[in-house]
């Protein structure tokens, strides 16, 4: 779970309390092992994020996410499987995770790479 993620377990009550004063709706949120939730995503009540799933940054997740799938957007929609994501981006894998590079060392390394090593959208 990255920075700015909000996990909501209830909501919607204020809009109907003029008709039903004690109205409150709750839903448990479950985040399974190895799930990744991108920055500033909103996870709504009752949602399960499946094992190994990826939620793109800024997504609003209103429905459960199956295991090993990638979702994104508002509302979050299916993009691809995690395996398809890996295959699509494998050529851009710079393999620097876990090398304990300082920010200065990482910057120096990245500046030595040719342009085609970087992901383009």
Predicted regions and their residues:
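Flexible, glycine/small-residue-enriched loop-and-beta-strand segment within the central core
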Residues: 1-48, 75, 81-83
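Short acidic capping loops at alpha-helix termini that bridge into adjacent secondary structure
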Residues: 33, 51-52, 67
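Beta-rich strand-turn-strand
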Residues: 39-55, 59-63
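Hydrophobic alpha-helical segments of small multi-pass membrane proteins
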Residues: 1, 27, 57-60, 70
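Short, glycine/charged-enriched secondary-structure capping and boundary segments
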Residues: 22, 69-70, 84-87
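Acidic, glycine-centered active-site loop in nucleotide-sugar glycosyltransferases
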Residues: 66-67, 72-75
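Terminal amphipathic alpha-helical/low-complexity segments used for targeting or macromolecular assembly
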Residues: 74-121
């Amino acid at each position: 779970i990255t920075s700015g993620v909000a996990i909501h377990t209830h909501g919607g009550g204020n809009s109907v309390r003029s008709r039903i004063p004690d109205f409150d709706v709750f839903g448990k949120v479950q985040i399974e092992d190895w799930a990744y939730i991108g920055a500033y995503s909103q996870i709504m009540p009752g949602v399960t994020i499946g094992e190994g799933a990826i939620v793109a940054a800024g997504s609003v997740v209103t429905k459960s996410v199956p295991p090993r799938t990638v979702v994104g957007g508002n509302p979050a929609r299916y993009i691809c499987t995690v395996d398809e994501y890996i295959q699509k981006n494998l050529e851009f894998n710079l393999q620097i995770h876990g090398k304990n590079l300082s920010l200065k060392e990482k910057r120096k390394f990245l500046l030595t790479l040719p342009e085609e090593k970087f992901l383009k959208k």
